[in-house]
């Protein structure tokens, strides 16, 4: 029986150094391997010219350099009119994840939205991924491979490379903290080809308090986005079940500490859902919650998901909500929904490609406007 090969990028530098020592090689070989992968983008041990042929062979017998591949049985990237691109990747265990490339209309900024888990344990009611349940965490290598693969594609197809990374794909990144942190450290390492500053990395969380505290403790000054979606406790509990464990008051307290540690605004993501969270009273509650927090509001046009009984807010409701927020001193941006037509926008990561799971129509409550 052939030995199952593992992705060498799943190892931290320290773990790889220990492994290299166990092979009777000097520990600095680990740094050479990392340099080949992350500075030069090689995908084969045979390309690592300063390693002996025998050592290259030994590594190739036990490890691979790349752990993801685009799906062969589906369109791995589909071009929309705005040139948003969805990538569907197959992992070594036949699970699937998605990444979304979002170019800027007016600048050279190239943003990649990446996944951190297969599925998600937090079961947000408006999100297709939440109905998958949690399958597993992504490894360090699987997280980084999304950036490596799209960088190669981008260089071949359009020129340039990824400049911004947002952990807003499948999964809760702060529930896969160690692997996401290790990936961020590599993405921001000036010795490697990514050369992405921490200010251009955004970690989005549903409000997982232990993870936010760990993020504060690390000193990693990346941007923080909170999937808030309501400042009404009962409504937020309906939308985001973890809110039953971590209340809005608890969330506000930890975000105040985050503001004290990092002098940059927190982004509150707010999907406007008709008759759920889009009334003027909802806007007033949002402004009260935000008082005392250095923050901005990113309003999102809700993208309808098959079999989930939520609807996007009508334009009139949206504009009234925005006006009320501005009246109360909030900084508001509206995220252009780019990629909904290819099931790539928030909440649209294609559940059917992950493990063929279907879910029945979800009934949701309605709140008066």
Curated annotation (Swiss-Prot):
Binding site for [4Fe-4S] cluster: 120, 124, 127
A GO biological-process term: tRNA methylation
Cofactor note: Binds 1 [4Fe-4S] cluster. The cluster is coordinated with 3 cysteines and an exchangeable S-adenosyl-L-methionine.
Catalytic activity: adenosine(2503) in 23S rRNA + 2 reduced [2Fe-2S]-[ferredoxin] + 2 S-adenosyl-L-methionine = 2-methyladenosine(2503) in 23S rRNA + 5'-deoxyadenosine + L-methionine + 2 oxidized [2Fe-2S]-[ferredoxin] + S-adenosyl-L-homocysteine; adenosine(37) in tRNA + 2 reduced [2Fe-2S]-[ferredoxin] + 2 S-adenosyl-L-methionine = 2-methyladenosine(37) in tRNA + 5'-deoxyadenosine + L-methionine + 2 oxidized [2Fe-2S]-[ferredoxin] + S-adenosyl-L-homocysteine
S-S pairs: 113-346
Radical SAM core domain ranges (all copies): 106-341
Gene Ontology annotations for the cellular component aspect, listed alphabetically: cytoplasm
CC cofactor: [4Fe-4S] cluster
Signal peptide feature range: none
Compartments, as annotated in UniProt: Cytoplasm
InterPro entries: Aldolase_TIM, Methyltransferase_A, RlmN_N, RNA_MTrfase_RlmN, rRNA_lsu_MTrfase_RlmN/Cfr, rSAM
EC number(s) stated in the UniProt entry for this protein: 2.1.1.192
Ligand binding (S-adenosyl-L-methionine): 171-172, 204, 227-229, 303
Main location: cytoplasm
Keywords, ordered alphabetically: 4Fe-4S, Cytoplasm, Disulfide bond, Iron, Iron-sulfur, Metal-binding, Methyltransferase, rRNA processing, S-adenosyl-L-methionine, Transferase, tRNA processing
Location of the active site: 98, 346
MF annotations from Gene Ontology: 4 iron, 4 sulfur cluster binding; metal ion binding; rRNA (adenine(2503)-C2-)-methyltransferase activity; rRNA binding; tRNA (adenine(37)-C2)-methyltransferase activity; tRNA binding
Keyword S-adenosyl-L-methionine among UniProt keywords: yes
Family: Belongs to the radical SAM superfamily. RlmN family.
Further comment: Reaction proceeds by a ping-pong mechanism involving intermediate methylation of a conserved cysteine residue.
Function per UniProt: Specifically methylates position 2 of adenine 2503 in 23S rRNA and position 2 of adenine 37 in tRNAs.
Entry-linked HAMAP family: RNA_methyltr_RlmN (MF_01849)
NCBIfam families: rRNA_mod_RlmN (TIGR00048)
The protein, known as: Probable dual-specificity RNA methyltransferase RlmN
Species name: Chloroherpeton thalassium (strain ATCC 35110 / GB-78)
Lineage of the species this protein comes from: Bacteria, Pseudomonadati, Chlorobiota, Chlorobiia, Chlorobiales
């Amino acid at each position: 029986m052939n030995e199952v090969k593992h992705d060498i990028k799943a190892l931290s530098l320290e773990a790889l150094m220990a492994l290299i020592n166990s092979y009777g090689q000097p520990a600095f070989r680990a740094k050479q391997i990392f340099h080949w992968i992350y500075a030069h983008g090689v995908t084969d041990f045979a390309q690592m010219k300063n390693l002996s042929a025998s050592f290259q062979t030994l590594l190739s017998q036990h490890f691979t350099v790349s752990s993801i591949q685009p799906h062969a049985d589906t369109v791995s990237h589909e071009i929309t009119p705005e040139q948003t691109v969805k990538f569907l990747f197959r992992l070594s265990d036949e699970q699937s994840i998605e990444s979304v490339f979002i170019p800027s209309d007016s600048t050279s900024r190239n943003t990649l939205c990446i996944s951190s888990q297969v599925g998600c344990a937090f079961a947000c009611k408006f999100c297709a991924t939440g109905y998958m349940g949690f399958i597993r965490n992504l490894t360090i290598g699987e997280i980084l491979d999304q950036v490596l693969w799209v960088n190669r594609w981008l260089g071949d197809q359009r020129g340039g490379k990824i400049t911004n990374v947002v952990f807003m794909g499948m999964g809760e990144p702060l529930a896969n903290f160690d692997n996401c942190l290790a990936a961020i450290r590599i993405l921001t390492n000036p010795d490697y080809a990514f050369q992405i500053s921490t200010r251009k990395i955004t970690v989005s969380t549903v409000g997982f308090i232990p993870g936010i505290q760990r993020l504060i403790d690390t000193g990693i000054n990346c941007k923080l986005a909170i999937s808030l979606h309501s400042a009404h406790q009962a409504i937020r509990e309906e939308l985001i079940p973890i809110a039953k464990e971590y209340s809005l008051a608890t969330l506000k307290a930890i975000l105040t500490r985050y503001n004290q540690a990092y002098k940059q605004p927190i982004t509150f993501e707010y999907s406007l859902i008709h008759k759920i969270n889009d009334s003027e009273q909802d806007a007033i509650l949002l402004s009260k919650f935000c008082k005392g927090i250095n923050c901005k509001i990113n309003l999102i046009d809700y993208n309808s998901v098959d079999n989930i009984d939520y609807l996007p807010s009508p334009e009139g409701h949206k504009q009234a909500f925005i006006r009320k927020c501005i009246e109360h001193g909030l900084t508001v941006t509206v995220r252009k929904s780019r990629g909904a037509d290819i099931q790539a926008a928030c909440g649209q990561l294609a559940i059917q490609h992950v493990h063929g799971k279907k879910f029945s129509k979800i009934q949701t409550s309605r709140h008066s406007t």
